[in-house]
UniProtKB/Swiss-Prot annotation:
Post-translation changes: 4'-phosphopantetheine is transferred from CoA to a specific serine of apo-ACP by AcpS. This modification is essential for activity because fatty acids are bound in thioester linkage to the sulfhydryl of the prosthetic group.
This protein's pathway: Lipid metabolism; fatty acid biosynthesis
Modified residues (O-(pantetheine 4'-phosphoryl)serine): 36
Transmembrane domains' residue ranges: none
Alphabetical keyword list: Cytoplasm, Fatty acid biosynthesis, Fatty acid metabolism, Lipid biosynthesis, Lipid metabolism, Phosphopantetheine, Phosphoprotein
Annotated gene: acpP
UniProt protein name: Acyl carrier protein
Annotated function: Carrier of the growing fatty acid chain in fatty acid biosynthesis.
Protein localization: Cytoplasm
Species of origin: Chlamydia trachomatis serovar D (strain ATCC VR-885 / DSM 19411 / UW-3/Cx)
PROSITE patterns, alphabetized: CARRIER, PHOSPHOPANTETHEINE
Length: 77
């Protein structure tokens, strides 16, 4: 699976949304109806999966699925 597929699968699992609803430009709050607890749990799962810590400041900037994918790509390089 690609990074994008991995991230989308985690989002589907964590937020309980349909895979068809998870697009690169989907906003966690507006499009996927996530609340702050959902986002905290999502960040924790991403940290565990990709084995690095996401600072609170960075987490606040991750507003869309694409933001998360780009952030992880940058951290992995």
């Amino acid at each position: 699976m690609s990074l994008e597929d991995d991230v989308k699968a985690i989002i589907v699992d964590q937020l309980g949304v349909s895979p068809e609803d998870v697009k690169v430009d989907s906003s966690f709050i507006e499009d996927l109806n996530a609340d702050s607890l959902d986002l905290t749990e999502l960040i924790m799962t991403l940290e565990e999966k990709f084995a690095f810590e996401i600072s609170e400041d960075d987490a606040e900037q991750l507003r869309t699925v694409g933001d998360v994918i780009k952030y992880i790509q940058e951290r992995q390089n």
